[in-house]
């Protein structure tokens, strides 16, 4: 089977832009361990917020028949995706929730204050709070991305989170949660990806097959030989797609299904195209998105299921 990426990263900008960035970096490296900010490096390595905001808005409208206006980004970190959602339309609002105060403060200074004007800022709210404790205001859509819900290590805790998402959504609202897996993610290994002026290193550091706990780390290395070791450290549980689907259904979501990423046969990595599948491929590593919809008020489970069945999603 084709081997896919095992690193939890999202598609970056266009190939032309990547080549341009790399060319500039080759002339004069921008980053060293002393000067580089880890959040900047993370956003350049892992996130594609403008693209994600566009894609999830498109998926939401395909599933529901209405535009995505109110978004909640759980585990939002620097809230860059929420910022881009607010920028997309003058009626868009966003709520970003994260426990880490310094990360939220960094996001406000470097993302909110630089990407948004005063009117747009008025439509964005950032909360330093536990995602289990936030229910208001209800949102059209909740995103739980970059596998951050994996901080919940037992079924009871993750189930409580999914139930809270259900209660926090408006009728007909959507929950999207990305997931990763495959035999390759269980191996102790370090994947290195060159970026413009630095190298992103995804370290699958430790895995316990009994608890399904995995420790992952992100390191950054630079052309001058310096490094930022363990810039980010994650203590996660690897949740299976079957477990996630069951928890979504138990919480009350309807038409719970999986969008499975296809393979780029030229390089064996993910191709950024997600399609609904009932049976996954036996790939060494894979990326997928679990989708659930809260029933419309007064509607049964059949109507929304029929409306969304068979639709495909693209992230490119």
Q: Where does each model-flagged region fall?
A:
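Conserved SAM-binding loop
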Residues: 107-108
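C-terminal lobe and adjacent flexible extensions of AdoMet/dcAdoMet transferase-like proteins
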Residues: 238-316
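Conserved class I S-adenosyl-L-methionine
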Residues: 67-77
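A short glycine-rich, Lys/Arg-flanked "PGG" loop and its adjoining helix->strand segment in the class I
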Residues: 158-171
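SAM-dependent methyltransferase
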Residues: 176-247
């Amino acid at each position: 089977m084709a081997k896919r990426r095992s690193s939890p990263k999202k598609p970056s900008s266009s190939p032309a832009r990547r080549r341009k960035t790399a060319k500039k970096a080759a002339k004069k490296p921008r980053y060293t361990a002393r000067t580089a900010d880890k959040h900047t490096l993370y956003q350049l390595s892992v996130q594609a917020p403008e693209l994600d905001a566009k894609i999830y808005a498109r998926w939401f409208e395909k599933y529901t028949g209405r535009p995505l206006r109110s978004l909640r980004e759980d585990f939002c970190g620097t809230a860059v995706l929420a910022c881009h959602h607010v920028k997309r339309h003058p009626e868009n609002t966003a709520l970003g929730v994260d426990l880490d105060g310094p990360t939220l403060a960094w996001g406000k200074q470097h993302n909110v204050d630089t990407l948004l004007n005063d009117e747009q800022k008025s439509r964005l709210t950032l909360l330093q709070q536990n995602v289990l404790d936030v229910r208001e205001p209800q949102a059209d859509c909740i995103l739980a991305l970059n596998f951050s819900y994996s901080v919940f290590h037992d079924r009871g805790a993750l189930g409580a989170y999914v139930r809270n998402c259900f209660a926090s959504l408006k009728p007909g609202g959507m929950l999207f949660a990305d997931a990763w897996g495959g035999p390759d993610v269980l191996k102790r290994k370090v994947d290195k990806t060159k970026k413009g002026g630095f190298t992103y290193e995804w370290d699958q550091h430790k895995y316990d097959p009994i608890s399904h706990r995995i420790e992952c780390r992100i390191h950054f290395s630079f052309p001058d030989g310096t490094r930022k070791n363990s810039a980010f450290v994650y203590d996660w549980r690897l949740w299976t797609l079957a477990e996630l689907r069951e928890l979504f259904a138990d919480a009350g979501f309807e038409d719970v299904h999986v969008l499975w990423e296809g393979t780029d046969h030229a390089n064996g990595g993910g191709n950024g195209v997600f399609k609904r599948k009932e049976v996954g491929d036996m790939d060494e590593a894979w990326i997928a998105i679990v989708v659930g919809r809260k029933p419309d008020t007064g509607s049964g489970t059949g109507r929304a299921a029929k409306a969304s069945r068979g639709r495909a999603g693209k992230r490119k």
